[in-house]
Amino acid sequence: MITARRVARELALLSAAQVLRQPKLLDESDCRSLILMAVRTLASDVRDTLEQAGTELSESQRLLRHSEFQLPHLEKAQMVLQDALQRAEKGLNKIGAALDLPEILYFAHQEEVQAYAIALLRCLQRYQNEIEELVNRSMVDWQLERLTQLDRAIIEIAVVEMRYLEVAKQVAINEAIELAKRYSDEGSHRFINGVLRRISEALDPAQAATGN
């Protein structure tokens, strides 16, 4: 389910790298400019995703025609048919992903969404040193610098919510997992979940002691 805050997190994620490159603290106007760029990126994603879906579906149709008229051998025809079906499935999955994007774009223009995205970005920049220290302490046999830029931003946005914006820890973790599933590599969400759970326990020693 798409919510205003989920969209705000996506906008913050798409803007995070630019924010962390800035040598001085950004004001609200600077953040709004970055968010506008993020909205344009989302709009571009809609077009790209639909174009890719069309390409996959067209290729699947071509392969099916090829297998019907030019492949008399059953085994080879079956291989081509399997490839065609995989491409068709990939195209349909891309269309399914694109269906959410118009609603995301609708939310992205709302003031409450942009205001929350700005709060995330400004906290991310203002408390960067504290956030990095907390994340590094919670990594097991890993270092923050070795994370992909995307995974690092997802983790740090969740830390901002848990530590500075008083979002319930489990909510922040769950939302980070959803961001990872949407934007990061397959399997990254499990790693991110583990890191954030350790951070949650570090922020709440009583929770760590009881195991809840």
UniProtKB/Swiss-Prot annotation:
GO terms for molecular function: RNA binding. Pfam families: NusB (PF01029). The keyword Methyltransferase does not apply. GO terms for biological process: DNA-templated transcription termination; transcription antitermination. Keywords: RNA-binding, Transcription, Transcription antitermination, Transcription regulation. GO terms for cellular component: cytosol. SUPFAM superfamilies: NusB-like (SSF48013). InterPro entries: NusB-like_sf, NusB_fam, NusB_RsmB_TIM44. It comes from the Bacteria. PANTHER family: ANTITERMINATION NUSB DOMAIN-CONTAINING PROTEIN, N UTILIZATION SUBSTANCE PROTEIN B-RELATED. Belongs to the NusB family. Involved in transcription antitermination. Required for transcription of ribosomal RNA (rRNA) genes. Binds specifically to the boxA antiterminator sequence of the ribosomal RNA (rrn) operons. This is Transcription antitermination protein NusB. It comes from Thermosynechococcus vestitus (strain NIES-2133 / IAM M-273 / BP-1). The gene is nusB.
